[in-house]
Amino acid sequence: MEKDSQATSSDTSIEKEGVISQSLSKDGIPNQSLSDDHIGIENISVQPSKLYEAVSALRNYGFNYLQCQGGYDEGPGKNLVSFYHFITVDDFQKIEKIKEVRLKVFLKRDSDLSIPSLYEIFKGSDWQERETFDMYGINFIDHPNPKRLLMPEDWRGWPLRKDYIQPDFYELQDAY
């Protein structure tokens, strides 16, 4: 994906590069620092084509646990976002020493909504990616089981998108 076609967040300001963002840049992985969250966790935006490379680098930096993967919709006509929250886990690590970082991939709603699956790096991403696909329609390339998780297989649409129109269920109510 070319830089000018990359979706950017409409509600997240660009910030001075954080430590992890600087490390990714030194390793030749393009990224954009976003403002830290309310508890100081570094947020970084990466292009969909660089996600797998960025996550592999994070794993090498010691971020060995995918705590959470999810999605959200910035609003009708705006971006869909896939986010990944990574932490360091060590048997002898004190809780206050845990490092955390969050990667975000911004996808234009009207463009290709495909990004690499992280299943080969983090097996725990399996159901999390399936839920994000099921609710937002973000496709995870090379996912081992790319099926809906919560909705029936024949369901149309993506229920957590803000522009989703709920189907009329009167015919189902009359059946009972």
UniProtKB/Swiss-Prot annotation:
Localization per record: Cellular thylakoid membrane
One of the GO biological process terms: photosynthesis, light reaction
EC number: 7.1.1.-
Domain of life: Bacteria
Topology in the lipid bilayer: Peripheral membrane protein
SUPFAM superfamilies: Nqo5-like
Broadest EC class assigned to this enzyme: translocase
Keywords, alphabetical: Membrane, NAD, NADP, Plastoquinone, Quinone, Thylakoid, Translocase, Transport
Annotated spans, Disordered: 1-30
Catalytic activity: a plastoquinone + NADH + (n+1) H(+)(in) = a plastoquinol + NAD(+) + n H(+)(out); a plastoquinone + NADPH + (n+1) H(+)(in) = a plastoquinol + NADP(+) + n H(+)(out)
Listed GO CC annotations: plasma membrane-derived thylakoid membrane
Biased composition range(s): Polar residues: 1-12, 20-30
Single GO molecular function: quinone binding
Main subcellular localisation: membrane
Family, similarity comment: Belongs to the complex I 30 kDa subunit family.
Task performed by this protein: NDH-1 shuttles electrons from an unknown electron donor, via FMN and iron-sulfur (Fe-S) centers, to quinones in the respiratory and/or the photosynthetic chain. The immediate electron acceptor for the enzyme in this species is believed to be plastoquinone. Couples the redox reaction to proton translocation, and thus conserves the redox energy in a proton gradient. Cyanobacterial NDH-1 also plays a role in inorganic carbon-concentration.
Quaternary context: NDH-1 can be composed of about 15 different subunits; different subcomplexes with different compositions have been identified which probably have different functions.
NCBIfam families: PRK12494.1
Protein name according to UniProt: NAD(P)H-quinone oxidoreductase subunit J
